[in-house]
Curated annotation (Swiss-Prot):
Gene Ontology BP annotations: translation
GO molecular function, one term: structural constituent of ribosome
Biological classification of the source: Eukaryota, Viridiplantae, Streptophyta, Embryophyta, Tracheophyta
Purpose of the protein: Binds 16S rRNA, required for the assembly of 30S particles.
Example of a GO cellular component annotation carried by this entry: small ribosomal subunit
Superkingdom in the source lineage: Eukaryota
Pfam families with a match to the protein in the record: Ribosomal_S14
Family stated for the protein in its record: Belongs to the universal ribosomal protein uS14 family.
Keywords: Chloroplast, Plastid, Ribonucleoprotein, Ribosomal protein, RNA-binding, rRNA-binding
Sections of the chain in a coiled coil: none
Assembly information from the UniProt record: Part of the 30S ribosomal subunit.
Region (Disordered) residue spans: 1-54
Source species: Piper cenocladum
Entries under InterPro entries matching the protein: Ribosomal_uS14, Ribosomal_uS14_bac/plastid, Ribosomal_uS14_CS
Name of the protein this chain belongs to: Small ribosomal subunit protein uS14c
Amino acid sequence: MARKSLIQRERKRQKLEQKFHSIRRSSKKEISKVSSLSGKWEIHGKLQSPPRNSAPIRLHRRCFLTGRPRGNYRDFGLSGHILRERFHACLLPGATRSSW
């Protein structure tokens, strides 16, 4: 189980990313439209003004049961070992066990 403070920090980053998403998107569109280098530098300065944690690259996908940041399956939103436990308990329909 991940520490609760790490999970809360991740939620805070998600809220910040949603808040500044439109600003980042509009600034990136402006950069592509402007042809002069000085104009691009000005817009680049605007892109650097939002907080670092508002960047989408800083978000982690976490298991929604345990909060584990690694080994997650996007389709289920679960980490690998939780996914395996759910498969064995027949809580996720349509999955078959592999045996070799």
